[in-house]
Amino acid sequence: MQIFVKTLTGKTITLEVEGSDNIENVKAKIQDKEGIPPDQQRLIFAGKQLEDGRTLSDYNIQKESTLHLVLRLRGGMQIFVKTLTGKTITLEVEGSDNIENVKTKIQDKEGIPPDQQRLIFAGKQLEDGRTLSDYNIQKESTLHLVLRLRGGMQIFVKTLTGKTITLEVEGSDNIENVKTKIQDKEGIPPDQQRLIFAGKQLEDGRTLSDYNIQKESTLHLVLRLRGGMQIFVKTLTGKTITLEVEGSDNIENVKAKIQDKEGIPPDQQRLIFAGKQLEDGRTLSDYNIQKESTLHLVLRLRGGMQIFVKTLTGKTITLEVEGSDNIENVKTKIQDKEGIPPDQQRLIFAGKQLEDGRTLSDYNIQKESTLHLVLRLRGGN
């Protein structure tokens, strides 16, 4: 098949490859075309750096996919930039780059204008005109990025779970605005938030300046639950959902909340706690379900069932199917989940390759059966 490789200069190279080619082979082909030694090449696809020993198929790279080529320069190096939110950015630089260049690279990656960036290394603020070498910044050093906001400032909000959120605010922001920013970041409705500073609960209509809250102050966030509590719901896929509930909520209400979060109709939900299936008309209190209890969610499918599909990479996908589904339908469901076109899928069960026109029932595939997915790569076309 053909794939494309795009360089940082914007040039695009076309390569003839097979799905079974490993990344080392691909780098050798790039060397043949462009003369760039493999050890100076870094290949990126879907935001991931590709490892030499893995194959194109491992990364689900298909015909006409585009890889990005970044040069790893001798005399060049990688450094890391850590933001106050804890995010780490990786930059390709040279010792001779000045701080202004580095800020431009950060702008390219993160969209933050250089004049709002302050870079700190070994406790010192770095000056634009100086170079990385001047500050003895070497490969894999970590710089710290602090934002310089016009009239603005950063404050921190600490939750009861110990998590710290960073907010960009101005002194003239009122507490209501701050709660809205917290909602944007964390999804907690303002009317469930209580903010505490210096032991005082903050009132919505007052501003940060009214409370003498200055840059890098820390507020404490307490959740105001109306006689309420949090419980957890664990699905068969291992995902855990957090719900805000009250002891007086009945099981039907809980299923409605799960539908709001996950889109699963209540009549397809079975909830289990302490080994018992919960009945719709009963309340959480009836079952002695208390704060931070974990319920288990099992899907009840109309004539339906769950099956598993295992890929060559070892990943297992869960599908909701019915015995009357034909193999073509199943491949479409896999495409919806994984993006793999049906014509590149071969499904194997009990050692047999499954034919598109036949149904799951034809092959006696029952609930919780495991199919194996093999990719069919069209040779080198």
Curated annotation (Swiss-Prot):
Q: Where on this protein does the Glycyl lysine isopeptide (Gly-Lys) (interchain with K-? in acceptor proteins) crosslink form?
A: G76
> Gene3D superfamilies from the xrefs?
Phosphatidylinositol 3-kinase Catalytic Subunit, Chain A, domain 1 (3.10.20.90)
- What SMART domains does this protein map onto? UBQ (SM00213)
Cellular component aspect of the GO annotation = cytoplasm; nucleus
Task: Tell me yes or no: is Lipid biosynthesis among this UniProt entry's keywords.
Answer: no
- Give residues for the crosslink Glycyl lysine isopeptide (Lys-Gly) (interchain with G-Cter in ubiquitin): K48
Q: Which residues form the propeptide?
A: 381
| Single GO biological process annotation from the record | modification-dependent protein catabolic process
- Where in or outside the cell? Cytoplasm; Nucleus
Where is this protein chiefly located? cytoplasm
**What UniProt keywords apply to this chain's record, in alphabetical order?**
Cytoplasm, Isopeptide bond, Nucleus, Repeat, Ubl conjugation
Which PANTHER family has this protein been placed in?
UBIQUITIN (PTHR10666)
Q: What is the name attached to this protein's record?
A: Polyubiquitin-A
The gene behind this protein is ubqA
